[in-house]
Every structure is written in structure tokens, then in C-alpha cells.
């Protein structure tokens, strides 16, 4: 039986609080006393209450509005909360003395909701204890690293009915959960002035009719969501229909809702400001809990304090920087300036010699190429550097800047600096191949044929007898920074080692996505003259080997659950094009364009 909102609210209060007065119902629901009186008459006429209490028919009617379960989404990295989220999931942080997800579970249990599922992914093992402590169910989202949270909803779609959808890191100052809910809703709070949040427009009965990202003086989405069975039954087929589309991978579950908003009935549940907190940054949580940082058990912040000699309370303006393919980095400031904390990415300990990187950083500092470097822990892989305000990356399409980059390469190569470690694209590629095989047989079409070509190119290049010197080996535009004074820095020396001088050119061409004309021009800048055919051939051998090496590296990262994206295809294409071409140049001993 379908109940009007007023009838539902009145019947619910009568069921939960036997003997409750109409005045108390009005206070609890926000309905006027007259509306409560009208609802009492309506419920009596429908035989849903008898003598001011719910009848058996009334309790049966209320049952279809009973909340069945709750889903807590806890799979994501929460990159905006870096660097704390590098160490543990955001939902496990302690705010005002309580662990966020535990507080939320306790609020659900207090509302009589005992069927609780936690969807995990990033650092999933940190959540397993919740099964024993609270009796929750754990569901692992295997796609958390490559897809947005619509994948978490997909993992539990068969559990959706009358269901709360929650985020593990929300903090509710009052318990928002209820045993009975009238209709699907999204919690909203009011923002005075401009906001970047998702702002809602509503129609009759507060149904959400449209949503815009950003607005002013608007109600915006925040906190818990409730799917009633009608919403769940309509939403799941819509999600299934688009799930396998590549465009869906980056979509939040809300995007699928918005794409179908005319067909999905969801209302806005309005809350007073200060009821729901999501803490999008460290500074936000510190405003709410001034002692948060002091009470935080964080190796990252301990590292910062120990290296810089600052107080933990000084650390501020913490926010993530654009993440690299191998590491996670964040900005922070103290009273002494701005800095970058680099946290090693998952699996990098098997790929990178951090002792060599630390030694190379010191050499780069001494050469005046990277004086941002402050400290690196060679055992753990974390690093602290100075932050360069208003910095920009080198433009690989700007000939003058390319010339400067090539002069930096020549400076490094011609220095007497040396490392104990070596770097070789072919050896590295074979190392990555071994790591890849740990995930099972390599059944990528054409893989073995490409690996055989790489071996032949390596043999030809070695026979050239080219100089071995200190090389950067991740030498491309994103690792070049220009400051406000046009000073050029070459950063991130984690792949550095003693190698064939052409290694840096190979990386540059591949990772800057140079065409052949641009590559040849860069080579002219490197030699400060037109290169010989033999020099062209040798350097392009390293373009081929760099492409192949990073292609195999990408396959490893994808196998580990990381999302490399288009770079995998870029690396593959350079390997495919130049492995065959360079072999032809060696076999035929002349250069051919195209």
C-alpha cells in the first residue's frame, strides 16, 4: 500500500513511539499540528490505526518502507586527502576521538539497521577487522583503481533494495539514519554564496529535477543517499546497460543517475548546515577537529617533522599534486616555505633502486640541475623537495626549450659523475617481463615477436660501442620545470644510472611523443650539429628500446591493478614502429624516412 508523505510520517512515529501525542509527532516530523490531525483521520479511515495506535494493517503497510540494509563505499584512494590517505584509507581516520567508518556503523546499528556491507578496494585489508567487530559484510571491488565508484555499486547491485548508500569518510553530527524511510533521497545542505559542489534544483514534493556542478546560494548534495526499492529496481538495469562502455569507467554512480534523472525519482532531504561533513582536505578536518594532526599517527608527518625540524602544527596547505605513473606526491607548507612530499607508488620497490636514486639526486644538486632536492629515504623511497611556485613544464614543441633540455642532457653525460648502479632498457624490460610472468603466462598477441625484435636491436646497439655515462632515463618534459625566473630544473631521478648516452634521447622522444622530424631536431641540439647516420641509427635504437621497455612496464602496472591508460598504447606504438625500422637501418646501412 502506498502512503502519502504525511500519512507515512505520522504512522511511523506512532509505530516507533507508542502513545506519542500529536504535538510530539508535529515536533518530530516538522508537520504542522493540523497536518498531523488530518493524517490521523486519513489513517483511521483506511483502518491503518485503531485507538490512536497502528493496526496490523498499518504495520503491514509500514513494512514496505522499512530500510533493509546499508552499503558503505570504502574502495577509493581519496587522493584529495593526501598524504594521509597514502598510509591508510580515509574512512579509518580518527576524528574527534572516533574512527569515521566505525562511528557511521554504530549510527546505523543504533537505527536498527544491522545488514551492513562495506565495499573495499584500496588497502582493503585495513577494513577486514570490521567483520569481527561489527558483523558487517565485506565485498572487494577489484576494479577500484581503474574505475570510479559506479563499479562499487555494480559489485553490490544484487543487494540494492531499500538501501542506504554511504561514504566511509562522512561524519554526521547527529544520526541521520532511520528504520523507515518514505522515498529515495539524497541528503543536501545549503551553501550561501558560490560553491563548487553539486547543486540541485527541485520540483513537486522536493523531487530532484536537475543538478549542476557549481552554483551559488544553492542546496547541494552531501552525505548519505537512500535508494528505495523502486529506485533500485529502475537504476540497476540502467547501470548494467552502460557499464561496459569505456565512457562509464570514470563515472560516479551519480553520473548514471543524472543521465537518467527524468526516469529516476529521487527527492532532496534537507539538513541544517553543520550536520554533515565530508572533509575534502586536511585543512577542513583541522577546522572541525583542531587536535586532529597532533593526535594523528602518521609516519608521513613524522618524516616531515624530522627532516625539516618543524612542529607538526606548522604543516598546512596540504593538497595532492598531479600523480605520476609511479609515485604519489603532495604539496605542503610550513613557516619556512613550500615543499613536496613524494610517496612511493605500489610495487615500485620491485622496480626502482632507491639508493641509486638518492645518490643521483645529490649529484643533480651539485651540478645545479635540481636544487629542489632536500632529502630521500633510500630504504623507504619517500622524498622531500622544495616546491617551485608558478612552475611550468618544458614545452617539447618549443625549439628553444628543446635546445635547453638537450644541453642539460649533454651536461649530465659529459660530467665525471658516476653511480654504482647501471641502467639498461633491455635489461629493465626483461626484468619487467619476469614480474609480468608472476601474474601468469603472457598471452598478449604479438608480444613474443616484439620481444625478439628488442633483443636484436639491443645486440646491434651494443656493437656500436657508444659511451656509457650517467643518464637520467626518465628524461621528458614533465620532469623539467621552469620557475618564474626561467631557471630550468630536471627532477625525479629514480631511474638514473650508468647507461648508454642514447638512453635519455630514447625516453625523450617516446615520452614527449615526438615525430621523426622533431626527434632529429632534438638530436641536432644535443650534438650542436647535424648528426651522422650512425648517430641517428644508434639513438633511434634507444627510441625503440625505450618504447619496448616502458610498454612491458605498463603491462606490469596494469596487471598489478594500476591504470596506465593511453601511455601503454603510446609506448607500444613507438616500439612497434622503431624496432623494425632500426633493424632495417642496421641491416641496410642507410637511413630511410617514414
Residue ranges and their predicted role:
Residues 502-531, 544-562, 581:
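Active-site activation/catalytic loop segments of kinase-like enzymes and analogous catalytic loops
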Residues 172-248:
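Conserved core of the sugar-phosphate nucleotidyltransferase
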Residues 299-317, 417-473, 484-485, 577, ...:
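An alpha-helical support segment within catalytic cores of ATP-dependent transferases
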Residues 265-372, 459, 463-464, 469, ...:
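Conserved NTP-binding catalytic cores of kinases and kinase-like/nucleotidyltransferase enzymes
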Residues 289, 296-297, 553-594:
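ATP/Mg2+ or Mg2+-diphosphate-binding catalytic cores
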Residues 127-198:
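Conserved beta-loop-beta/alpha segment of the NTase-like Rossmann-fold superfamily
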Amino acid at each position: 500500500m502506498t502512503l502519502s508523505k504525511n500519512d507515512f510520517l505520522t504512522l511511523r512515529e506512532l509505530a516507533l513511539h507508542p502513545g506519542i501525542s500529536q504535538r510530539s509527532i508535529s515536533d518530530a516530523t516538522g508537520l504542522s499540528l493540523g497536518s498531523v490531525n488530518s493524517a490521523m483521520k486519513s489513517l483511521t479511515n483506511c483502518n491503518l490505526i485503531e485507538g490512536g495506535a497502528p493496526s496490523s494493517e498499518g504495520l503491514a503497510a509500514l513494512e514496505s518502507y522499512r530500510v533493509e540494509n546499508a552499503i558503505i563505499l570504502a574502495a577509493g584512494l581519496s587522493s584529495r586527502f593526501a598524504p594521509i590517505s597514502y598510509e591508510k584509507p580515509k574512512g579509518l581516520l580518527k576524528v574527534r576521538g572516533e574512527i569515521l567508518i566505525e562511528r557511521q556503523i554504530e549510527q546505523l546499528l543504533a537505527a536498527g539497521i544491522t545488514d551492513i556491507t562495506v565495499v573495499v578496494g584500496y588497502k582493503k585489508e585495513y577494513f577486514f577487522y570490521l567483520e569481527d567487530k561489527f558483523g558487517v559484510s565485506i565485498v572487494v571491488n577489484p576494479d577500484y583503481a581503474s574505475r570510479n565508484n559506479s563499479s562499487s555499486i555494480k559489485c553490490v547491485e544484487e543487494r540494492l533494495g531499500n538501501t542506504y548508500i554511504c561514504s566511509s569518510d562522512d561524519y554526521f553530527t547527529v544520526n541521520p539514519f532511520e528504520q523507515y524511510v518514505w522515498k529515495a533521497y539524497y541528503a543536501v545542505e545549503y551553501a550561501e554564496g558560490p560553491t563548487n559542489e553539486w547543486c540541485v534544483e527541485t520540483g513537486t514534493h522536493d523531487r530532484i529535477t536537475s543538478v549542476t556542478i557549481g552554483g551559488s546560494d544553492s542546496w547541494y548534495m552531501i552525505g548519505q543517499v537512500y535508494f528505495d526499492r523502486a529506485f533500485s529496481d529502475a537504476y540497476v538495469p540502467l547501470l548494467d546497460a552502460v557499464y561496459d562502455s569505456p565512457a562509464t569507467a570514470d563515472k560516479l554512480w551519480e553520473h548514471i543517475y543524472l543521465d537518467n534523472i527524468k526516469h529516476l525519482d529521487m527527492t532532496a532531504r534537507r539538513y541544517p548546515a553543520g550536520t554533515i561533513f565530508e572533509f575534502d582536505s586536511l585543512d577542513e578536518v583541522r577546522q572541525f577537529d583542531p587536535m586532529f594532526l597532533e593526535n594523528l599517527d602518521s609516519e608521513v608527518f613524522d618524516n616531515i617533522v624530522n627532516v625539516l625540524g618543524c612542529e607538526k602544527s606548522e604543516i598546512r596547505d596540504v593538497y595532492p599534486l598531479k600523480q605520476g605513473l609511479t609515485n604519489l606526491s603532495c604539496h605542503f607548507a610550513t613557516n619556512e616555505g613550500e615543499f613536496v612530499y613524494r610517496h612511493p607508488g605500489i610495487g615500485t620497490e620491485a622496480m626502482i633502486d632507491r639508493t641509486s636514486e638518492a645518490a643521483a639526486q645529490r649529484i643533480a644538486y651539485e651540478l645545479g640541475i635540481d636544487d629542489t632536492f632536500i632529502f630521500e629515504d633510500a630504504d623507504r623511497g619517500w622524498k622531500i623537495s622544495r616546491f617551485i611556485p608558478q612552475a611550468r613544464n618544458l614545452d617539447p614543441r618549443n625549439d628553444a626549450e628543446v635546445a635547453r633540455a638537450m644541453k642539460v642532457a649533454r651536461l649530465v653525460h659529459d660530467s665525471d659523475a658516476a653511480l654504482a648502479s647501471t641502467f639498461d632498457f633491455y635489461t629493465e624490460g626483461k626484468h619487467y617481463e619476469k614480474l609480468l610472468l608472476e601474474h601468469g603466462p603472457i598471452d598478449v598477441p604479438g608480444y613474443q615477436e616484439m620481444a625478439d625484435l628488442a633483443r636484436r636491436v639491443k645486440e646491434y646497439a651494443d656493437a656500436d660501442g657508444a659511451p656509457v655515462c650517467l643518464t637520467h632515463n626518465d628524461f621528458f618534459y614533465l620532469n623539467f620545470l621552469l620557475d618564474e625566473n626561467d631557471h630550468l630544473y630536471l627532477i625525479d631521478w629514480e631511474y638514473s644510472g650508468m647507461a648508454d648516452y642514447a638512453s635519455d634521447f630514447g625516453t625523450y622522444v617516446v615520452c614527449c611523443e615526438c615525430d621523426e622530424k622533431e626527434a632529429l631536431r632534438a638530436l641536432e641540439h644535443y650534438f650542436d650539429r647535424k648528426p651522422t647516420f650512425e648517430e641517428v641509427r644508434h639513438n633511434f635504437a634507444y627510441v625503440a628500446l625505450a618504447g619496448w621497455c616502458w610498454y612491458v612496464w605498463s603491462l606490469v602496472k596494469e596487471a598489478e591493478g594500476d591504470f596506465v591508460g593511453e601511455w601503454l598504447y603510446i609506448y607500444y606504438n613507438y616500439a612497434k614502429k622503431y624496432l623494425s625500422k632500426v633493424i632495417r637501418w642496421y641491416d641496410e646501412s642507410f637511413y630511410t624516412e617514414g
